[in-house]
Amino acid sequence: MGFNIAMLCDFFYPQLGGVEFHIYHLSQKLIDLGHSVVIITHAYKDRVGVRHLTNGLKVYHVPFFVIFRETTFPTVFSTFPIIRNILLREQIQIVHSHGSASTFAHEGILHANTMGLRTVFTDHSLYGFNNLTSIWVNKLLTFTLTNIDRVICVSNTCKENMIVRTELSPDIISVIPNAVVSEDFKPRDPTDSTKRKQSRDKIVIVVIGRLFPNKGSDLLTRIIPKVCSSHEDVEFIVAGDGPKFIDFQQMIESHRLQKRVQLLGSVPHEKVRDVLCQGDIYLHASLTEAFGTILVEAASCNLLIVTTQVGGIPEVLPNEMTVYAEQTSVSDLVQATNKAINIIRSKALDTSSFHDSVSKMYDWMDVAKRTVEIYTNISSTSSADDKDWMKMVANLYKRDGIWAKHLYLLCGIVEYMLFFLLEWLYPRDEIDLAPKWPKKSVSNETKEARET
């Protein structure tokens, strides 16, 4: 029999992004392996209630108040009744939460631990220690992950960051990278490429991403004019939206780059490949990055990558596919971009093999199989005493400083009082079980993983 798994996160379709696509593709491959998966997220405008996606993937859109960038208002306890009801209806065995900034992820782990379920958390981001937001998120994560069964990070740098932020044992933290659907990011047809080069003897640099400060938008608005002034045959395509969008508009107008810089705004994910295939170079100026899925997608389209070396980026692609900036600065990024332009112009590097290499390196089925190994491990080796409420409350008291530990302890006690109240008001044996979508039998790979 396969596992019954619940993915919890504030971020999911119709919003598009790296976390959202990670959850979707991982869930689809887990279903292909014979497991049952539901996703619990908040409502998005008219998407309220239960929706079914491809392959029988069920999504619960729970109506909750959203405060900032699709994150729900944190209340600690108010989500417990509905999440408990869903977990019992779906006979969930493993709760897998995603994202340090997701309220649903944090509260879902807390409620699942209280109910005695196995819990897994995947972190997709890097956080610092020198601003109020990072400190708050780190403290919250320390509380939430006190009784976690396993943590997954998308890069080794992300793992190191997680250990420092939460003081968790490295033994319970695994590294499983993101992946890409290489079939969705095939390079342009060689004949089309030849025709394009004959009709427009230009080098096109593509930038795709959310236009936020942490994604290097301030750097890009200074880099693009410098590169354009140095190379008459270079054009830019910028796709994305965010608070820095107006800065790009002002940059284009002030430097009179209307004919050389296309500002596309937000682009649907199904159109990202079409945008990438118009370019020769992909420029990534991010200030912080745990993995960088867009780099893999761009390389899969045979683009040469110019990027910073922050976070987990150096782990993503081999050196022959990338040109790194020595420092995260305008001058170094301009220098790296100039180097990439000269490589493309002189045809010193054949990028036509990038797609095949990427398709061999990254595959969602491999990610799913490695994740199932973690599910199997925590289900077979963990003791029932690990979810004893006295032990978990004691663990909360041992965490952090004198004030924090008492706050954690208070939250833990109130959580268990609410748990017993819900068990009395809404007994689990009176909750109707949801019928399961007809699924495949568990694959041989999963059986072998369990046996080993």
Curated annotation (Swiss-Prot):
Enzyme class: transferase
Membrane topology: Single-pass membrane protein
UniProt KW Endoplasmic reticulum keyword: yes
Transmembrane segments: 407-427
Gene3D superfamilies: Glycogen Phosphorylase B
Biological process terms in GO annotation: GPI anchor biosynthetic process
EC number(s) per entry: 2.4.1.198
Biological or metabolic pathway of the protein: Glycolipid biosynthesis; glycosylphosphatidylinositol-anchor biosynthesis
Secreted recorded as keyword: no
Reactions catalysed: a 1,2-diacyl-sn-glycero-3-phospho-(1D-myo-inositol) + UDP-N-acetyl-alpha-D-glucosamine = a 6-(N-acetyl-alpha-D-glucosaminyl)-1-(1,2-diacyl-sn-glycero-3-phospho)-1D-myo-inositol + UDP + H(+)
GO cellular component: glycosylphosphatidylinositol-N-acetylglucosaminyltransferase (GPI-GnT) complex
Pfam families assigned to the protein according to its UniProt record, in alphabetical order: Glycos_transf_1, PIGA
Family according to the record: Belongs to the glycosyltransferase group 1 family.
Function: Catalytic subunit in the complex catalyzing the transfer of N-acetylglucosamine from UDP-N-acetylglucosamine to phosphatidylinositol, the first step of GPI biosynthesis.
Protein name (database record): Phosphatidylinositol N-acetylglucosaminyltransferase GPI3 subunit
Organism: Saccharomyces cerevisiae (strain YJM789)
Protein encoded by which gene: SPT14
